[in-house]
Amino acid sequence: MSIKNKNAAKHLSGRKRAAGRAIGPACRLLVFATCATAVFSAQAQAQPTQQADVQTFSIPAGDLTPALQSLASSARVILTFTPEQTRGKSTAGLQGRYGLSEAFSRLLAGSGLSARQTANGYRLVAAEPLEELVIPELSVVSGLSDSVSAGRSTLNQEDIARVQADNVASLLDRLPGVSMAGSPRPGGQSLNIWGMGDMEDVNVVLDGAPKGFEKYRQGSVFIEPELLKRVDVDKGPHNLLNGNGGFGGTITMETKDAGDMLDPDENFGGLLKYSYHTNDRQGIYSGALYGRTEEGFADGLVYFSKRDGGNIKRPDGTRFAYSSNDQASWLMKSNLYLTDAQTLTLSAMRSESDGWQPFAAKRDDISAPSQADIDRYGRDEAWRRILVYRDQVDTNYSVKWNLAPEEQPLLNLTVSYAHSKTEQHDKRPDYASQYSYLGSLGNESWVSYVDQQLDMNNESRFSSGPLDHKLLFGVRWHKHKRDTLMYYPAQKNSASYNYGYFQPYYMPAGEQETRSAYLQDAVSYGSLTVTPGVRFDHVTNTGQPNRAPRYNDSDPAAGHDYSSVTYTGWSPHLGAIWKATSNLSLFADVSRTWRAPVIDEQYEVQSASSNVPGTSRNLKVERITGIRVGAVLDFNNLVTAEDSLQIRTTLFRNRGKDEIFYRRGVLCDAARSGGECGQPLSNYRNLPGYTIEGVEIESFYDSDRVFGSFAYSAIRGKRDASPRDPWGNQTWIAEIPPVTAHAVLGIKVPQWDAAFGWTGDFVRKQDRSPADGDPLASVWALPKTAGYSLHGLFASWQPTSLKGFEARVAVDNLFNHEYYPYLGESVSGVGRNIKFSVSQRF
C-alpha cells in the first residue's frame, strides 16, 4: 500500500495503583490500530516506483509541505510523510532539470530531512547525522507562511531535553513575554503571557485537548514535560482557531510519537532513561517502547515516566516543607494510515500524583504547628492537621481523522474529538479543626474539570488569476463542565448548609457550552500574503444551584440566580506578511475579539446578608483589540561559512474594554457620595478598560562551533481606573512582569561528540503597583521585588562510538543566588540545582 500521511495526532498515560486502569483502554486502542493496519495492508496493492532520469521542475519557495506534494505529483511517485515532520519548515524552491534524487535533496536542503526510497515509493526520514555536531537552538519563528506563524515561538524536542524542567511553566519561562507565576511547589504553577495570567487569558491545548484548572491558590497546568516533543506559543489574540478567550495567547503542546524516536533504518526500538536533580534529590525514571510496520502503515508508542523527589531547597539552605514531587505519567499513541489519503490517530495520556501538601500550592513557607499540638499529636500528625492529602488525576483522550487526496487540492478535511479531565480530591485528617476551613474548601473537597471538544475543518488550496489561496473553514463545539463539592463538618447539623455538603460559594459548579464557526483565507501574491478571517461564537453559561439553601436563597433580594446566560459575537482578524528581501520579512496583525464570563465570574455568590450577595448574570462580554507589528531578519554565511543568524522584533498593543473583575471597594457610583446602592449587587462587574503594550526581541546564532540565543521582553500595562473603583484614578496592572532578558552561549566540540555552554537570566526590579495610583487597592497588588541575575551551565555528550547513548547535565542558579520572582508573590526562588540524565536507545 502507498501512503501520503497528511495528519497525525496524539497521546496516552497512567500511574501507581491506577496504572492498570490507564493502560487498559490504551492497549485496546493499540491492538485495534495493529489489527486495522493488517486489514488495510492486506487489501492494498503494491505500486512500482517510477522515477524519471531527468525532468524539469518549477516549484516556488514557501512551505515545505505543498512543495513536496508538488514534486511527488510531478514525478508521479508516492511520498510518505507526517505533518509533524514538515510543520513550520520552508524551502527555497526548485527550478530546473534534475534527477529525482537530486530534486529531493535540493528541495529538502536545510530541513534536516531526506527522502528514502522504499518498495512503493519514497518515505521522508530524518537526515543522516553529519560529521559535525548540530545543536538545535530555541526557534525564533515557527514559519513565515503567514503572520500568525511568523509571530509564534517554538520549543522543539532538543530545547525541552536541554532544560530538564520539573514542570511546563519553568520550561516556558525562558521565552520572551512568557512568565511562570506561582511557586516551585508541585502543582503550584500557572502561566502569564504578555501580562495576562488568569486561566481564561491563557489557553492551553495538549494534543488537541483544551486544558485548564482554576482553584484558589492552585496552579493551572499539570503536564509532564518528559512526554512533550514540541511546544508552540501564540502570543496575543491573533489566532482565530484558538477560540473564545485566550487574550494573552495560546500554548499548544504535542506529545512524542514513534516517528520521533525511531532512526531512519529502524522499525522497532526502546528507550531507558534516568535523571537526577540534586536540589530536591529527585529521581526521574523513564522508559518507552515504539515501532512501526515495515512499509509505514502504522506506528505506535508506549512511554512511561515517574518522578520521585523530596522537599525543594531554597538558596538559604532551608526547604519548602511538604513540597515533594511524586508523579507518574503514561503516554500511548498510534497512527493508522488507512489509505494513501487517510490518516487516523488515536491517543491517550494519564498523569497521577498524591501526597501530603499545603492546601495552597502557590505559597512559600507554612506556619509550623504549635508545641502544644506537637506534644498532643506527635510531630508528624501535628503537621498533617494543617495539611491536606491531595489525590490528583489528569487524563486526555483524543482521536483525529484526516482526508487529503493529493489530486484534490480543494479537500483537506480534518475531524477531531478530544476529552480532557482533571480531578483533585483533598482530605484533611479526622482530627483537624472542624471550624477553620470554610474559605479553603472545608475538611474534604472534590473538584473536577471536564472538557470535550469536536472540531471539523477543511483547507482548500486554489488560485484565482495571480492570487494563490489557502482557504480554511471550520466549525467547533466545546463543552466545559466543572463540578465542585466540599464537606464542612462544623455545619453538619445545619439544614441551611445542607448538613455540611455544598459547593463552595466562591467556586461554583456549572457548564459553559461554545459553538463556533471560523473562516480564514491566506491570499498570496508574489512575496506578499494577506490573511483576512472571522470567527463567530455562541456561548451559553449555566450555573448549578448550590446544595446549601444559604447560597441558593429563593428570595429575589439575595440575587441567587443560577439560570443560563447566552452571549454571541464576531471576532475579525487581518494579518499580513511581506518577504521584502531574502533577508527581511515584515509582518502585522490586527484582531478584535471578546470573551464570555467564565463560570466563577458568572455564578459566584455570598449569603443574602452580604453587601454583594448575587450572581453576575448582567455582565457584558470583555473585549480586546490587539495590534502587533514585527520584522524577521535572517542571514546565512554571515561570519563563517554555513553559519546563520535570525532576529525577530515585535511591538504589540492590546486595548481591553469592559474588563470582568470583582465588585469590591466602591460598590457603585452612588456610594462615592454617600448614597445607597441598588440591591442585590452582583459579585462581579465590568471595569472601564486597560492597555497593555510592549516590545520583544528574539534572536539566535548557529555555526559549526558556536551557538547562542538572546531574548528580551519589556511590557507595561495600566487600567483606566482602580480595580476597586471604576471611577477612580488610573492604576498599574499588578500582573505585568518586569523587564527580562535571557541569554545562551554554547560551544560545540565535534571531536568529543559534545557541546557545553552558559545560560543567563536577567530580571529588572518591579516597582509598579496598583497601590501607587490608589493606596486602598493594595489588596490587588503584588509585593514589589528587587532585580536579580541567575547563571547556569549545561553540557551534552552523544558519543558516536556508543550508538543511542546520551548524557546531559545542567546547572540552574549556579551561584545559589537568593531571589524572589515578582509573579511568585514573595515566594522564594529555588537554590542551586544540578540536573543530569543518561539515556540509552536500543
Q: Each predicted region: which residue ranges?
A:
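Acidic, small-polar-rich N-terminal luminal/periplasmic segments of exported/outer-membrane proteins
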Residues: L68, A72-G88, A92-G96, F104, ...
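Surface-exposed extracellular loop regions of Gram-negative outer-membrane beta-barrel proteins
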Residues: E352-D354, A360-S367, S494-A495, T540-D553, ...
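Short loop/turn motifs that connect adjacent beta-strands in outer-membrane beta-barrel proteins
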Residues: N242-G243, A258-F268, E294-F297, A341, ...
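Membrane-embedded beta-barrel scaffold of Gram-negative outer-membrane proteins
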Residues: Y274, G296, G300-F304, N412-D430, ...
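Gram-negative outer-membrane beta-barrel transporters
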Residues: N458, S524-V530, V539, V639-G656, ...
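Face-selective signature of the C-terminal outer-membrane beta-barrel domain
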Residues: T343, M349, R390-R550, V639, ...
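Periplasmic-side early beta-strands and strand-to-turn transitions of outer-membrane beta-barrels
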Residues: G259, G270, A288-I386, K765
